[in-house]
């Protein structure tokens, strides 16, 4: 599974996919906007989809998820600092990690329709789930 994801990941444009996915998360699950109060105008779907801070942060998030592919046996240690930050500083509900993973799957399927096989989806879902679990580690 992870070889399949690693091979696919090289085709993923973190800027385009990450920005679109985070924007989609904020539109589809509006309560997640409370974590982004410093990002400026989130008043409409259009504003969110064109918000430079949302797009840049989405790229950063997707790049961090991609970094996890280099540490498949050690995700919890790899994401320990990010887990603490999201738990202790940002107080992000860990259920949101699963929502974001689902949104990433949706956006990737949209962009890579022809190569988005059930096997790839399964492998991607396993990776996003493992990353979400690692990020939730600091929660008590």
UniProtKB/Swiss-Prot annotation:
Gene3D superfamilies: Globins (1.10.490.10). GO terms for cellular component: blood microparticle; haptoglobin-hemoglobin complex; hemoglobin complex. Red blood cells. GO terms for biological process: hydrogen peroxide catabolic process. The keyword Metal-binding applies. Heme b binds at residues 57, 86. Pfam families: Globin. GO terms for molecular function: haptoglobin binding; heme binding; metal ion binding; organic acid binding; oxygen binding; oxygen carrier activity; peroxidase activity. The keyword Metal-binding applies. Involved in oxygen transport from the lung to the various peripheral tissues. Belongs to the globin family. This is Hemoglobin subunit beta. It comes from Pelophylax lessonae.
């Amino acid at each position: 599974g992870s070889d399949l994801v690693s091979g696919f990941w090289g085709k993923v444009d973190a800027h385009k996919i990450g920005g679109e996915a985070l924007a989609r998360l904020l539109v589809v699950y509006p309560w997640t906007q409370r974590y982004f109060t410093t990002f400026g105008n989130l008043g409409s779907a259009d504003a969110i989809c064109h918000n430079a801070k949302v797009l840049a942060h989405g790229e950063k998030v997707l790049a961090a998820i991609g970094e996890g592919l280099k540490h498949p046996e050690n995700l919890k240690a790899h994401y320990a600092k990010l887990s603490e930050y999201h738990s202790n500083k940002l107080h992000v509900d860990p259920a949101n990690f699963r929502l974001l993973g689902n949104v990433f799957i949706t956006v990737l399927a949209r962009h890579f329709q022809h190569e988005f096989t059930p096997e790839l989806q399964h492998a991607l879902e396993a990776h996003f789930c493992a990353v979400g679990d690692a990020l939730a580690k600091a929660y008590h």
